[in-house]
Amino acid sequence: MCIRDSFQAVPSQRLSYPTQLHPFNCYRHLRRINPSPYMFYVDCGDAQLVGASPETLCQIVQGKVAVHAIAGTVRRGATPQEDAALGEALLQSPKDRAEHIMLVDLARNDVNRVCDPTTTRVESLMNVEKFSHVIHLTSRITGQLRPDRTKLDALRSIFPAGTVSGAPKIRAIELVSQLEQERRGVYAGAVGRIDYAKHDLDVCIAIRTMTFKDNTAYLQAGGGIVHDSVEEDEYIE
């Protein structure tokens, strides 16, 4: 990462595989082997989306805006002792800590644009959170939506997440668009629900998401690249 006007960029790679598997059967299998906070199956007619996303893009309940940022990943251990050691090593990694704090600050600025600045909080910072196959560093950023802003204003301010684009966000997106040969489609987008009766919203980032179309399954994955990234480590992550 040698470009001076960007701290981080998140390039991704698209994979495809021919399949006769029904997408809903894939969804059922995914629920069993990889349960996640956001499980979804969306039938769009000519394409189907199957997802197991761990990351909240934007959640609004009674005017409280919340972002659940994930940055920093390591595999689960084979034993409880190895699990604990891997989680602690991730938490103490200077590179992962710096990258995580940078993305938390970006999310805080996104939330602050539509919330009362006196209410914006980092409620939790760099929690070690364990999922079925990986360990993540996670943080929660919240704020109270201003009366002159709507839930869609909040969604626009936060989208796309810095964890799948980079920082500064606009410049990182420009860099990624030069590197990736195809448009991302649903990958790194948003899937969720909007409740117009209660004015609530709960939307996740479309990561760990497959698109089924024309008997082909498409999967896309990316990773944050910073100045001191090790290529092999980032690819494995």
Tell me what each language-model feature is:
Residues 1, 5-237:
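Extended alpha-helical targeting/anchoring segments
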